[in-house]
Swiss-Prot record:
Provenance organism: Brucella melitensis biotype 2 (strain ATCC 23457)
Annotated NADP(+) binding sites: 85, 134-138, 158-163, 226, 249
Biological or metabolic pathway of the protein: Metabolic intermediate biosynthesis; chorismate biosynthesis; chorismate from D-erythrose 4-phosphate and phosphoenolpyruvate: step 4/7
Gene3D superfamilies documented for this protein: Leucine Dehydrogenase, chain A, domain 1, NAD(P)-binding Rossmann-like Domain
Lineage, top ranks: Bacteria, Pseudomonadati, Pseudomonadota, Alphaproteobacteria, Hyphomicrobiales
Record's protein name: Shikimate dehydrogenase (NADP(+))
Encoding gene, per UniProt annotation: aroE
Length: 289
């Protein structure tokens, strides 16, 4: 039996609350059509108080697995009977699948972050030092990716220093916590600068200048933002003006979807320019560029 036959009729999902904003159905729908797989992928809105029962009834509802987004990632972590290494390190699950009747959880955000940089800025992981702006939940996946790829020194800057200290304590050696007032000084020797904050994101002061001067960064430094709405954030615009190589956050969204699709439908999809343009067209239609 070939992979297409095995995947026939398989169902997967993305769940969050709310979930109508998600572009995951567009991504997976594109791949299902491209690969000729007779499967489905749908958005399912689940309230926080209903998540545990939803996760427990995946098989009964005919699902092979699915993606989990805000606010359910920690609840999915707790619900999973088995966790992959990335999920354990990050403390959150964004991908669920069934294996011999057991609910398994993984986290593909770190993979997506690194794969996006591999595609758009090959050699990025030769940087000895990385600067991560922000210490929220998303920064954990970024830090895990950096450590996994051998970055020697990761500085995490956050307005509330205690949040950065918690993150540094979680990951241990090679991760260092700093207050926001130290960010400017840290730029000068950072080979990779990652923005995980909402500064410049739609509804968070878009159009405003990013409050850090990037002209003192090494000329070979790479700047990347995990935000993809808007596609060109204030941070990326400032980095581009400073002459740095920039990588937007859309690729992370696309690449993080790959491992889950392969688990549910049995074929590994490709992140192509055609897929990117498909999502960009939807973003333009929604006024999200």
């Amino acid at each position: 039996m070939d992979d297409k036959s095995m995947a026939r009729g398989r169902k997967a999902f993305v769940t969050g609350f709310p979930i109508r904003h998600s572009r995951s159905p567009l991504i997976h729908g594109f791949w299902l059509k491209e690969l000729g797989i007779d499967g489905s992928y749908e958005a399912v809105e689940v309230k926080p108080e209903d998540f545990s029962s939803f996760a427990a009834s995946l098989a009964a509802n005919g699902f092979a697995g699915g993606n989990v987004t805000i606010p359910h990632k920690e609840a999915a972590y707790a619900a999973a009977e088995s966790l992959d290494e990335a999920a354990r390190a990050i403390g959150a699950v964004n991908t669920l699948w069934l294996e011999n009747g057991r609910l398994c959880g993984g986290n593909t955000d770190a993979y997506g972050f690194a794969a996006n940089l591999d595609a758009s800025a090959p050699g990025w992981d030769k940087a000895d030092r990385a600067l991560v702006l922000g210490a929220g939940g998303a920064s954990r996946a970024v830090v895990h990716a950096l450590l996994s790829r051998g970055v020697c020194h990761v500085s995490v800057v956050n307005r509330t220093l205690s949040r950065a200290e918690e993150l540094a304590a979680h990951f241990g050696a090679r991760v260092y916590a700093h207050g926001w007032d130290e960010a400017q000084a840290l730029v000068s020797n950072a080979g990779l600068i990652v923005n995980t904050t909402a500064l410049g994101m739609s509804g968070h002061g878009e159009g405003q200048d990013f409050p850090i001067d990037l002209t003192c960064a090494p000329k070979e430094a790479v700047a990347t933002d995990i935000v993809y709405v808007p596609l060109r954030t204030a941070f990326l615009n400032k980095a581009e003006k400073a002459g740095l190589k920039t990588v937007d956050g859309l690729g992370m969204l696309l690449h993080q979807a790959v491992p889950g699709f392969e688990r549910w439908f049995g074929q590994r999809p490709q992140v192509t320019q055609a897929l990117r343009e498909h999502i960009l067209a939807d973003m333009a239609k929604a006024g999200a560029l």
